[in-house]
Design a protein with these regions (language model features):
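Acidic, surface-exposed loops and disordered segments
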Residues: 1-177
Length: 177
């Protein structure tokens, strides 16, 4: 089944069609985010869901490079969390981000993670600060990522299992075979 193969088929998609997402698709994506595990069930994450084309275009400038495709996505999900609610907010937000991506793949949609934390715009402004400014995000929340989602605009081959680096797997101790 596709569920068994999600990690094989989930590939970063930076090219999208013009087709919008259905409300059911958006709700399913957000359910996956809200069901994602978090440390001590702190649920320190929050999400801003953007489908407005002008806002997507503006958000596409959140980094100096590797974010322009956000403008062509049907949806962008900004993943943020409250460091005061969890000392492992980065991990919690990262898990939520990948849950959104895996759910997108399961729906037959494409997605791509845009890293915001510790990145900068073309003018040198911290990407986190840029995103805070355009989306009116409260200061206590830190933005980790933007997940761009849409209908796939190109085909990508599944991950080639022949390239798996099995030497990075250690049994019982480092170096164990």
């Amino acid at each position: 089944s596709l569920h068994d193969a999600l990690p094989i088929y989930r590939r970063s998609m930076r090219k999208f069609t013009d087709e919008e997402l259905t409300q059911d698709e958006v709700v399913t994506l957000m359910k996956a985010a809200l069901m994602s595990p978090s440390s001590k069930r702190s649920n320190s994450w929050q999400f801003v869901v953007i489908d407005d084309k002008e806002m997507l275009k503006e958000l596409s400038h959140c980094k100096e490079q590797a974010s322009s495709f956000i403008a062509d996505a049907a949806l962008a999900i900004v993943v943020m969390a409250d460091p005061l609610a969890s000392d492992v907010w980065i991990e919690d937000a990262a898990i939520a981000s990948i849950m959104i991506q895996l759910q997108a793949e399961d729906l037959g949609l494409g997605s791509c993670w845009v890293q915001v934390r510790e990145r900068f715009t073309a003018t040198g402004m911290p990407s986190d600060e840029f995103v805070h400014g355009i989306l009116d995000i409260p200061l206590q929340l830190q933005v980790l990522s933007v997940i761009a989602v849409g209908h796939k605009g190109m085909e990508r081959k599944p991950f080639n299992e022949e390239h798996l680096q099995w030497e990075k797997i250690h049994i019982n101790k480092f170096g164990g075979k």
